[in-house]
């Protein structure tokens, strides 16, 4: 029996309309009744996730910013990781050959240089939104991550530029087909889940995890039971071909699987 369940949000727990379904909420409550520790492991900001947990009265640990922050049930900061100031400066000041929009995160929020209302659709559930700033005046010493949002092919070309400029000084990953992230070296959900399990006196073998994108790769590959969403990025399936694939987030597939796991633990599971 798993003792901790870790969930990605977008494309995993959240439905395509960016809401948590009633079946999902009911299943999360059932897990807590079984004393299974809940952990939300997401690229979203800690401020947003703390607001969501408060609104839902859910007790859960938070891995946010794709591993840049870890918070306890009480909101205590357990782990932090920031981009080195020189890396942040290079990424912010360089003229990249891309049409993608740039987004900067620190403990105070989400910042960008231009209005982009379409991006806010993903935050209708929480109301979280960006703040418009002069990017060149951003304090460099407290940047947690920098994201580029745009067309996937354009971002793939940008990824090559970033690799050439940064070398091994940052970790690059796609958190979605339209979002490329620049993170601190060694920063990923799997690495910080290790930190959290050690804090809780657990091992990764005691954990199950669910995800859909390349920012979930290390987490899914390191836990005792990792599950890939049916709507996952093809690259994730290719990287972890041995892991089971469940249904689509639009059908609340995580809830569907966990309901079976709770009620019929000894029977084989089918996502149909």
Curated annotation (Swiss-Prot):
- InterPro entries the UniProt entry points to: Cof, HAD-like_sf, HAD-SF_hydro_IIB, HAD_sf, HMP-PP_phosphatase
- GO molecular-function term, one example from the UniProt record: magnesium ion binding
Q: Keywords on this record?
A: Hydrolase, Magnesium, Metal-binding
Q: Could you say which enzyme class this protein belongs to?
A: hydrolase
Instruction: Write out the residues that bind Mg(2+).
Output: 8, 10, 212
User: What residues form the catalytic site here?
Assistant: 8
Listed Pfam families = Hydrolase_3
Which domain of life does the UniProt lineage start with?
Answer: Bacteria
PROSITE patterns from the UniProt entry: COF_1, COF_2
Q: Which reaction does it catalyse?
A: 4-amino-2-methyl-5-(diphosphooxymethyl)pyrimidine + H2O = 4-amino-2-methyl-5-(phosphooxymethyl)pyrimidine + phosphate + H(+)
* Signal peptide coordinates: none
Q: What is its EC number?
A: 3.6.1.-
What CDD domains does the record point to? HAD_Pase
What cofactors does the UniProt entry give for this protein? Mg(2+)
To which protein family does this belong?
A: Belongs to the HAD-like hydrolase superfamily. Cof family.
Q: What role does this protein play?
A: Catalyzes the hydrolysis of 4-amino-2-methyl-5-hydroxymethylpyrimidine pyrophosphate (HMP-PP) to 4-amino-2-methyl-5-hydroxymethylpyrimidine phosphate (HMP-P).
- This protein is called HMP-PP phosphatase
């Amino acid at each position: 029996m798993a003792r901790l369940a870790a969930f990605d949000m977008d494309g995993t727990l959240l439905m395509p309309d960016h809401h948590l379904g009633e079946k999902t909420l009911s299943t999360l409550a059932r897990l807590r009744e079984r004393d299974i520790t809940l952990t939300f492991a997401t690229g979203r900001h800690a401020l947003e996730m703390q607001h969501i947990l408060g609104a839902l009265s859910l007790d859960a640990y938070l891995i946010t910013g794709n591993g840049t922050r870890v918070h306890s049930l009480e909101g205590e900061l357990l782990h932090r990781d920031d981009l080195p100031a020189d890396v942040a400066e290079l990424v912010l000041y360089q003229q990249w050959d891309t049409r993608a929009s740039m987004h900067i995160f620190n403990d105070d929020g989400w910042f960008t240089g231009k209005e982009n209302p379409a991006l806010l659709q993903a935050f209708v559930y929480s109301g979280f939104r960006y703040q418009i700033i002069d990017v060149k005046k951003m304090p460099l010493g407290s940047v947690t991550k920098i994201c580029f949002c745009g067309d996937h092919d354009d971002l793939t070309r940008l990824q090559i530029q970033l690799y050439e400029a940064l070398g091994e000084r940052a970790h690059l990953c796609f958190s979605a087909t339209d979002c490329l992230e620049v993170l601190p070296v060694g920063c990923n959900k799997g690495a910080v889940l290790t930190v959290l399990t050690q804090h809780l006196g657990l091992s990764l073998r005691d954990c199950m995890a669910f995800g859909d994108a390349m920012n979930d790769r290390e987490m899914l590959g390191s836990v005792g039971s990792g599950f890939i969403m049916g709507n996952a990025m093809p690259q994730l399936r290719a990287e972890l071909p041995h892991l089971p694939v469940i249904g689509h987030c639009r059908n609340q597939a995580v809830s569907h699987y966990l309901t079976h796991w709770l009620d019929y633990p000894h029977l084989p599971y089918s996502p149909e």
